[in-house]
């Protein structure tokens, strides 16, 4: 199955993905469900795969001194070989940073002339 799932999952999946704050039972349940989803559908956190020891965060609360990586690209292993890059782009206008994903196409698709011609 070919899956690309991205978004704000509202929890840090690993200790490396969070500084500050506290852990709750509710968060542990959500983390467990996301990890089960990844196992059941053979999904990889591609950013973590590319940056196994890096601490970089996608959400921050400066008043509480908490930073977490809450935003993920989860990609099926079948498609993960097509990932050429993933990244986190710091934002100055939001408490969330953008996450990027670059995939290499398996085949060249020739572009048509478009509707203006």
Language-model features, listed with the residues they occupy:
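Surface polyanion/phosphate-binding segment centered on an Asp-His-Pro turn
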Residues: 2-4, 66-68, 73, 77-117
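Metal-dependent phosphoesterases centered on the DNase I-like endonuclease/exonuclease/phosphatase
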Residues: 1-75
């Amino acid at each position: 199955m070919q899956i690309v799932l991205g978004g704000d999952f509202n929890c840090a999946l690993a200790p490396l993905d969070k500084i500050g704050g506290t852990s709750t039972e509710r968060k542990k349940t959500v983390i467990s469900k996301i990890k089960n989803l990844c196992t059941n559908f053979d999904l990889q956190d591609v950013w973590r795969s590319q940056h196994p020891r890096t601490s970089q965060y996608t959400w921050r609360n400066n008043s509480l001194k908490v930073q977490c990586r809450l935003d993920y690209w989860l990609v099926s292993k079948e498609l993960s070989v097509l990932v050429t890059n993933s990244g986190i782009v710091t934002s100055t206008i939001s408490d969330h940073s953008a996450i990027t994903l670059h995939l290499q196409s398996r085949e060249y698709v020739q572009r048509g002339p478009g509707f203006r011609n």
